[in-house]
Amino acid sequence: MKFLNQITNYAKEAVQSAKYIGQGLSVTFDHMRRRPITVQYPYEKLIPSERFRGRIHFEFDKCIACEVCVRVCPINLPVVDWVFNKELKKKELKHYSIDFGVCIFCANCVEYCPTNCLSVTEEYELATYDRHELNYDSVAMGRIPYKVTQDPMVTPIREFAYLPAGVMSGHDLPAGAQRAGERPEAIANTAKSSEN
């Protein structure tokens, strides 16, 4: 009797483990049917979603130096330097900066700014070799932001991680459109043939 119980328990455990292995393999096979998600980075870029929070854009003329952005920031990051103008009886902004090496891109400063002098952009390329270059002042933050779809040297790609196979066309581009200019391989071949 004890022997039959052991065989029964062994069979139940074998069936249960086969069920768990089948569940795991079903996820694996689901991912195998998807297309590869490789982006040839400087020549192809993913288009950020509408709610993407990238580099913060700052408009110096709109700022009233109220320091609301500093108060709502979880890490008190924005540096606002101002002087009180006695003639006009109001604050004058002298300097504004944010260190994007420390910023967590929560966009609280943008949300609570009363004059809308701060806005988030689609820019996500903030890589530098020196961390001090990530400390953007009002001039660097005032640069006009660019969109990936407007860069002629880049093929914009929609985020396609969860799209069905075959649906990978870029935003704002006609079907079959290529990026402007030649690919680096073609330029290198042209240079080699002109040297010969």
Curated annotation (Swiss-Prot):
Cofactor: [4Fe-4S] cluster
UniProt keyword annotations, A-Z: 4Fe-4S, Iron, Iron-sulfur, Membrane, Metal-binding, NAD, NADP, Plastoquinone, Quinone, Repeat, Thylakoid, Translocase
Amino acids binding [4Fe-4S] cluster 2: C73, C103, C106, C109
InterPro entries linked to this entry: 4Fe4S_Fe-S-bd, 4Fe4S_Fe_S_CS, NADH_quinone_OxRdtase_chainI, NDHI
Region Disordered, annotated ranges: 174-196
Sequence positions that bind [4Fe-4S] cluster 1: C63, C66, C69, C113
A Gene Ontology BP annotation from the UniProt entry: photosynthesis, light reaction
Record's bilayer topology term: Peripheral membrane protein
Known catalytic reactions: a plastoquinone + NADH + (n+1) H(+)(in) = a plastoquinol + NAD(+) + n H(+)(out); a plastoquinone + NADPH + (n+1) H(+)(in) = a plastoquinol + NADP(+) + n H(+)(out)
Cofactor annotation remark: Binds 2 [4Fe-4S] clusters per subunit.
The protein's enzyme class: translocase
Entry EC no(s): 7.1.1.-
Superkingdom, natural source: Bacteria
Gene Ontology terms: cellular component: plasma membrane-derived thylakoid membrane
GO MF: 4 iron, 4 sulfur cluster binding; iron ion binding; NADH dehydrogenase (ubiquinone) activity; quinone binding
Subcellular location: Cellular thylakoid membrane
UniProt cross-references to PROSITE patterns, sorted A to Z: 4FE4S_FER_1 (PS00198), 4FE4S_FER_2 (PS51379)
UniProt domain 4Fe-4S ferredoxin-type: residue ranges: 54-83, 94-123
Family according to the record: Belongs to the complex I 23 kDa subunit family.
Oligomeric form and interacting partners: NDH-1 is composed of at least 11 different subunits.
PANTHER family from the UniProt entry: NAD(P)H-QUINONE OXIDOREDUCTASE SUBUNIT I, CHLOROPLASTIC (PTHR47275:SF1)
Purpose of the protein: NDH-1 shuttles electrons from an unknown electron donor, via FMN and iron-sulfur (Fe-S) centers, to quinones in the respiratory and/or the photosynthetic chain. The immediate electron acceptor for the enzyme in this species is believed to be plastoquinone. Couples the redox reaction to proton translocation, and thus conserves the redox energy in a proton gradient.
UniProt-recorded name of the protein: NAD(P)H-quinone oxidoreductase subunit I
